Structures are given as structure tokens and as C-alpha cells.
Amino acid sequence: MSALDKTMYFDFGQNEKKDVHQTLETVYNSLEEKGYNPINQIVGYLLSGDPAYIPRLNDARNLIRKHERDEIIEELVRAYLDKGEK
């Protein structure tokens, strides 16, 4: 069986999860500091991909753009489901 016939496996590593979590905290705090509703703004960004929903304050816009939106959503879903298990 050649390497092309094998299913690829992607591991969303622990460091990636921590980075996404830290980024979301920074973005959330920056949005609050600017007087915006952080949840609405983050959802707007995740749905549209438009970075204008995120302020430049504290480099939040550049930080969130370092992550793919699907990675952020994956981390949010994982955190939500993990919280429900406890």
C-alpha cells in the first residue's frame, strides 16, 4: 500500500488549543475595553471572516487572524462540550 492510499490523520495539538484559548481571551478583553459586545463581534468574525469585527487594540486583529476560523470553532465546541461533562 503506497503512502497515497493511506488516510491522513491530523492532530490538533495541546499547544494549538492553548494558543487559540489565549487569543480568544485577548480578543474578548480588547472588545470589552473598546465597549463592544465581545460575543456578538467574535460570532460576526467567525461567520463572515471579516477582520473588521475585531479591533486592532492589543494586536487582537492580528492575533485572531493567525488561526483558521475552523480551528477557533473547533476549540469553542470542544470547550463547550468538555464543560458539560463535568
From Swiss-Prot:
InterPro entries: IreB (IPR009309). Signal peptide: none annotated. It holds the Pfam family IreB. It comes from the Bacteria. Belongs to the UPF0297 family. This is UPF0297 protein LSL_1110. It comes from Ligilactobacillus salivarius (strain UCC118) (Lactobacillus salivarius).
